[in-house]
Structure formats: structure tokens, C-alpha cells
């Protein structure tokens, strides 16, 4: 499998590296880094002061060179009536997106003794692996430690591992 990472907007080298490393370690796949892209026209919703996640998925699918493609952006994303999303993917689709905007809170609430930088890096890895998992046909998992567990808050992201549980692993690999 080949996953193409599509940076959209200003994405740091650290975020690109963490995303790439996370995908390689969990899915043992080939990962490439696409040329940076501009924010998609029409993605911004002025009433919400946020960006439509679907527009980033469409961009990743359109310009990405992989069988699976994931956009990464620092912009604050939303989907339909949800206040925000960390990421979005369509089950079995070729495009997905994560936003680092809400992953950058300074601490994990005392869950671990890691630095803010380490916590952020782990969140990026988890969300990239989670969204690409959806494109591979994985649905949300009830196992709170599994990377495919639904995590609407950063606290819940922090609880899960950067790996698939046995059940999800059997379903995808």
C-alpha cells in the first residue's frame, strides 16, 4: 500500500515526520510527501470561522498519488453539525484529512509525564493512523486502547495507543 501525505497550508517538518512514521509503523506501507497545497477554495465558512473537512478530503483524493491519500492542515475543521473534528475519512475511500489545530493543547491532563511536544507528536500519529484506517474499511472500535476508538476529545485521544487492537489488525492486514 502507498499513502501520500498532502500538506495543506503551513505544516511543520515535525508533523510531516510524525505522520509518516506513524503510518509506516502501523501499516508497514510506503509513504510519500506531496508538494504543499493551498487551502481549497470554498472551504472556509465565515459564520463558523472554520473550514469544511470534506473540501480537504476532496483535495487529497484529487492531487494525491497514493492508493490512500491524507491531507494534513493546521486549520480548524468541522463536518456537518459537529463543532469540530480532529479528522475525517470516508469508509473505504481514497482521501482523508487530519487537523492539528485542536491537537496542540499543552498537556494531557496529567495522564503521563511526557512533554507537550511528545504529547502533540503522539496525537498526530494517532489521528493519521485512525483516518487512514477508515479508508482501509475499519470502523470505530469499542476498545478504548485501539487507535480506531472514536475520540471526540484530546483526553480520549491521549488514552488510546498508536496501534490497532487484535480485532482491527485482523480486519485490515
Curated annotation (Swiss-Prot):
Q: Which residues act catalytically here? A: 131
Q: Supply one GO BP term.
A: proteolysis
Q: Which cofactor does it need?
A: Zn(2+)
Top-level taxonomic group: Archaea
The answer to whether the entry has keyword Cytoplasm is no
Q: Where along the chain is Zn(2+) 1 bound? A: 130, 134, 140
What transmembrane ranges does the database entry give? none
Gene Ontology MF terms in the entry:
metallopeptidase activity; zinc ion binding
> What PANTHER family has UniProt attached to this entry?
ARCHAEMETZINCIN, ARCHAEMETZINCIN-2
* Protein name (database record): Archaemetzincin
Species: Haloarcula marismortui (strain ATCC 43049 / DSM 3752 / JCM 8966 / VKM B-1809)
Amino acid at each position: 500500500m502507498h499513502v501520500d501525505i498532502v500538506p495543506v497550508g503551513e505544516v511543520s517538518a515535525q508533523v510531516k515526520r510524525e505522520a509518516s512514521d506513524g503510518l509506516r509503523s502501523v501499516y508497514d506501507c510506503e509513504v510519500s510527501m506531496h508538494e504543499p497545497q493551498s487551502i481549497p477554495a470554498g472551504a472556509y465558512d465565515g459564520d463558523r470561522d472554520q473550514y469544511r473537512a470534506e473540501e480537504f478530503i476532496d483535495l487529497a483524493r484529487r492531487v494525491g498519488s497514493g492508493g490512500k491519500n491524507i491531507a494534513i492542515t493546521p486549520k480548524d475543521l468541522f463536518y456537518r453539525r459537529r463543532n469540530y473534528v480532529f479528522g475525517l475519512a470516508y469508509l473505504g475511500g481514497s482521501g482523508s484529512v487530519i487537523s492539528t489545530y485542536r491537537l496542540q493543547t499543552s498537556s494531557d491532563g496529567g495522564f503521563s509525564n511526557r512533554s507537550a511536544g511528545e504529547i502533540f507528536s503522539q496525537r498526530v500519529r494517532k489521528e493519521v493512523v485512525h483516518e487512514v484506517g477508515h479508508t482501509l474499511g475499519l470502523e470505530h472500535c469499542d476498545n478504548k486502547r485501539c487507535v480506531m476508538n472514536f475520540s471526540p476529545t484530546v483526553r480520549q485521544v491521549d488514552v488510546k495507543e498508536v496501534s490497532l487492537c487484535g480485532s482491527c489488525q485482523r480486519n485490515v492486514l
